Amino acid sequence: MADKDEAATRGNDWEVVSLTASAYAAAPGPKPVVDSKDDDHKEVTPCYEAETSHPLYMSRHFVFPPTGQLENTSDLTEASLTGSHCKEGSDLSLKGLDLSDDFGGLEFSEDKGKKEENIYTTAMSSLDDERAIGGSHVYEPVEEPTEPVSPSDVTLDLNPIKDDEVANSPPSEEAWWKRSVASLIAQAKETNTVWSICIAAAVMGIVILGQHWQQERWQILQQKWESSIGNEKAGRLMGPISRLKQAFVGGQRRDSFIRASAQNDR
C-alpha cells in the first residue's frame, strides 16, 4: 500500500512539473545577449546544465546576462562552444524525457546536497584561514581561585547563636567605666573650648578698653598742657600790664599827696 501511495504522489507531482514546463516552454524568452566588444556581433549563448526540468531553463526566463566589461574574448569562444554542447544535450534529454523524468527529483536533490556541502566546506576553510592569519587564540573561562576556609571562619559561621547572645548581653563594668570616662573627657574638651573662647573674648575687650582709655588720657593731658601754655602766655602778658597799672595808680596817689601837702602849707 505504501508503494502505491508513493507512486500516486509521484505521478501527481510529475503532472504538475510537466504542466509548468510546457507553460514556460511555450512562453517566449528574452532576446539573446550581444557582446559589444566583438566585431562580428555574435550572439552569446549562456551555458545551462542538463537537468530534469530542462524546458524551464531552456525557456530563458532565468537567464542573467553576462557583464561585457569583465569577460574576455577567450571566455566568449568557450561560452559559444559550451552553448552548442548544451543544445545537443538538451535535445537528447528532450527525446528521452519519459526515462529521465522518473529520477529527476533524485538528481536535483543530490546536486543540491553537493552544493550545500561545497558551501559548508568553503566557509570552514575561510574560518581556518582567518585563524591561521590572526593566530589561534583559544579563550578559556578564567576560574577564580578558591581560597581555603580556615577553621575559625567555620566556627564563626557554625555558632550564630553565641554571637547573638553576646550582642544582646548587657555591657560589663569596665566597658561602662570606659564609656563614662570617654564622655567626661569629651565634655571637658568641649568646656575647655568654650572657656578658651570666653577668655579670648575678655582679653580682646580689655585690650580695646585700654586703647580707648589711653586715647582719652592722651587727649586730657594734651588739653591740660595746652591750657597751661595759654596761662603762661597770659601771665607773661599780664605782668607788664599790672606793673603799668600799679605805676599809674602810684603816681596818682603821689599827686594827690603833693596837692594835699601844698594846701596845708598855704
Swiss-Prot record:
It is found in: Endoplasmic reticulum membrane; Membrane. It comes from the Eukaryota. One of its GO terms (cellular component) is endoplasmic reticulum. A motif (AIM (Atg8-family-interacting motif)) lies at residues 14-17, 218-221. Its main location: endoplasmic reticulum. Keywords: Autophagy, Endoplasmic reticulum, Membrane, Protein transport, Stress response, Transmembrane, Transmembrane helix, Transport. The keyword Transmembrane applies. Interacts with ATG8F. May be involved in salt stress-induced vesicle-to-vacuole trafficking pathway. Through its interaction with ATG8F, may enable delivery of the vesicle bodies to the vacuole by an autophagic pathway. Plays a role in seed germination in response to exogenous abscisic acid (ABA) treatment. This is ATG8-interacting protein 2. It comes from Arabidopsis thaliana.
